[in-house]
Amino acid sequence: MENKAINIRFAQETESEVILELIRGLAAYENMEDEVAATKEQIHETLFINKDAEVLLAEYKGKIVGFALFFHTYSTFLGKTNIYLEDLFVKEEARGKGIGRLFFKHLAKIAIDKGYGRIEWCCLDWNQKSIEFYKHMGAEVLDDRRIYRISDDKFKEV
């Protein structure tokens, strides 16, 4: 049974600052506060003007307590669009209430409705609570993959 006190909805254009606060909360949880360079203006432009990604917000008893930021990828093997979940975060005071599961249910509904092939994401290897949560949901770990990155300061060297 879903908790009526919890509402999952798409973020509105006026909520760039709230999204940035949640990103900072995630960064603090991951011990990466110094890595957040995004500004409210960048969040607004990339999410609501360029529409580079989408954001779901979780409200608990009328207060915003979490977010899920995702964008679309494509599988050449499946011939289908996928959802890539970049970030999922629920504030500490709202954890354990089923909000993470509701985010995934919402993403799964989007994927079903649009005929997408997968929902994929990565998780920090030390984040045991999240790993257990994902396993409990039936997610599979792809041990044969590694994530690589070229940052913007290296683009010209490629």
Residue ranges of model-derived segments:
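Conserved beta-strand in the GNAT
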Residues: L57, K63-H72
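Conserved acetyl-CoA-binding loop-helix of GNAT-fold acetyltransferases
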Residues: G96-K109, H136
